[in-house]
Amino acid sequence: YYASRGLGDVYKRQLELNKKKKKDALFNTAFELFTTKGLTKTTISDIVDQAGVAKGTFYLYFKDKYDIRNKLVSHKTGELFFRAHEAVQNAHISEFDRQVHFIIDYILTELNKDRTLLLFISKNLAWGVFKGAFEEKMPDDEYNFYQSYLDMLAQSGLHYKNPELMLFTIIELVGSTCYSCILYQQPVSLAEYRPYLHRTISGIMETFSQDHTTCEVLSSDTKTHVDHTA
């Protein structure tokens, strides 16, 4: 009985692994096609043929190419926040405001390095999709960014009036202002804009704070600040 149950568990894990591989193949292929051919010129047949999976497999996960596009934005954004969260843990930063500044810095640096990802995310991003990214389970199937954000906040002992609205405001600010700085160096370069952005984020956090404590802006000589050059 125990042997057969053990074999059943192994089979189940293998099945889940195969499903994940197929879904990842669809995601990776769709991303490549959407960013080279464009959404309009890409068909579901293009995606499944290049990914090497059956069309029926595609419909197990997605309704149509617009659905995979939306889920892909969530997936890519979720991966980005997952890596940012890992980086902030590795940096051993415990203060909530510093964690937020660090994560924003990390994400901006990654998007500055990967313009294709920036273009794809920014073209297709809406708060609903972002919320999906926060709630998406990441590599270990246990992590999701929004819960981690709430956990970081709880551990800090700080209190904010509406944590979700605060996060929304910060992300909307970063997304809408940094796009031109990264892609076109307009109105200024990202390097020049960063200090203003961080001060504005601190102002947003102060506005939402119930503790009336001032969030310290990271400076270039702060140990935990990541010195990124745009």
Sequence positions of predicted segments:
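Single conserved hydrophobic/aromatic residue that forms the stacking wall/gate
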Residues: 1-11
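Helix-turn-helix
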Residues: 25, 33-67, 71
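Short hydrophobic clusters on alpha-helical segments that form packing/core surfaces
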Residues: 26-34, 107, 174
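Alpha-helical DNA-contacting segments of helix-turn-helix folds
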Residues: 62, 69-79, 83, 121, ...
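Hydrophobic alpha-helical connector segments
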Residues: 71, 85-113, 167-170
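Amphipathic alpha-helical packing segments from all-alpha helical-bundle domains
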Residues: 78, 82, 129-157, 164-168, ...
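Short secondary-structure transition hinges
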Residues: 109-147, 183
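Hydrophobic/aromatic-rich alpha-helical bundle segments in the mid-to-C-terminal region
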Residues: 154-200, 208-219, 230
